[in-house]
Amino acid sequence: GIFSKLAGKKIKNLLISGLKNVGKEVGMDVVRTGIDIAGCKIKGEC
């Protein structure tokens, strides 16, 4: 019915926004790690 359609949409939206947040967190970690590695390569410390 209408309710299950709405609930499905809401759940889907929550999942999508949750995944986006997780993606952002993981992305930031990857970026930070990349910056650390680049920094130590430039300084010749790794």
UniProtKB/Swiss-Prot annotation:
<dbReference type="InterPro" id="IPR012521">
    <property type="entry name" value="Antimicrobial_frog_2"/>
</dbReference>
<feature type="disulfide bond">
    <location>
        <begin position="40"/>
        <end position="46"/>
    </location>
</feature>
<comment type="similarity">
    <text>Belongs to the frog skin active peptide (FSAP) family. Brevinin subfamily.</text>
</comment>
<dbReference type="Pfam" id="PF08023">
    <property type="entry name" value="Antimicrobial_2"/>
</dbReference>
<keyword id="KW-0964">Secreted</keyword>
<keyword id="KW-0204">Cytolysis</keyword>
<keyword id="KW-0929">Antimicrobial</keyword>
<keyword id="KW-0354">Hemolysis</keyword>
<comment type="function">
    <text>Shows antibacterial activity against representative Gram-negative and Gram-positive bacterial species, and hemolytic activity.</text>
</comment>
<keyword id="KW-1015">Disulfide bond</keyword>
<protein>
    <recommendedName>
        <fullName>Esculentin-1A</fullName>
    </recommendedName>
</protein>
<dbReference type="GO" id="GO:0031640">
    <property type="term" value="P:killing of cells of another organism"/>
</dbReference>
<dbReference type="GO" id="GO:0005576">
    <property type="term" value="C:extracellular region"/>
</dbReference>
<keyword id="KW-0044">Antibiotic</keyword>
<dbReference type="GO" id="GO:0042742">
    <property type="term" value="P:defense response to bacterium"/>
</dbReference>
<keyword id="KW-0878">Amphibian defense peptide</keyword>
